[in-house]
């Protein structure tokens, strides 16, 4: 299979023989769902990456971020508060799974600027508390801003501040799928 995990491992081994002016680490972003946690655990234990990023890309079996169909299949058929609650429930389980070193784009569910219908601050506090307890990093990811024009450049300001208050390590990320998106919009993020 082209672009398989084996191809990636071969690339890592080849690159580890090279010398770079910066520290280069190799990791993997893994799509997490509570239903696939045991499968992920059985697969991931066979690999040794420098880091593993766990991300939630779907809610109730539907991708929440695909312009072509997410609004039709998910957002227009469900109460936004239920979507947000399911998303953050999955984030909670991702953290508690102990499979990952960091959470990818932990508040990207906001990308379409749809009102959740409830105050997210208790959720932010709960997620921050869990992140601290499980010693997992949280991403301050710029992709919702540059891809979906969300006004938040990275994390919601209140969420970021709550994470900082809880001494949760925050990792800057751009979710680059193309070289041109590496570090995109980092200059707009609040200085740490």
Give the ranges of each region predicted by the language model.
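Hydrophobic faces of well-ordered beta-strands that scaffold small-molecule active sites
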Residues: 24-28, 52-54, 102-104, 138-140, ...
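Hydrophobic, aromatic-enriched interface-forming segments
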Residues: 78-116
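Alpha-helix N-cap and loop-to-helix initiation/capping positions
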Residues: 1-7, 75-86, 115-122, 148-155
């Amino acid at each position: 299979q082209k672009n398989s995990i084996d191809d990636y491992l071969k690339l890592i081994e080849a690159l580890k023989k090279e010398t770079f002016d910066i520290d280069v680490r190799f990791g993997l972003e893994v799509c997490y769902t509570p239903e696939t946690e045991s499968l992920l655990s059985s697969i991931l234990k066979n690999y040794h990456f420098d880091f593993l990023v766990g991300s939630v890309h779907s809610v109730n079996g539907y991708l929440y971020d695909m312009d072509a169909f997410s609004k039709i299949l998910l957002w227009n058929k469900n109460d936004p508060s239920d979507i947000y609650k399911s998303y953050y429930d999955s984030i909670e389980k991702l953290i508690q799974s102990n499979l990952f070193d960091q959470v990818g784009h932990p508040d990207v569910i906001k990308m379409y600027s749809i009102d959740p219908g409830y105050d997210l601050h208790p959720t932010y506090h709960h997620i921050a508390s869990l992140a601290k307890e499980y010693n997992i990093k949280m991403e301050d990811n710029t992709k919702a801003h540059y891809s979906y024009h969300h006004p938040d450049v990275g994390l919601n300001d209140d969420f970021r501040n709550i994470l900082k208050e809880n001494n949760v390590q925050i990792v800057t990320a751009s979710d680059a799928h193309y070289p041109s998106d590496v570090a995109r919009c980092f200059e707009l993020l609040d200085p740490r």
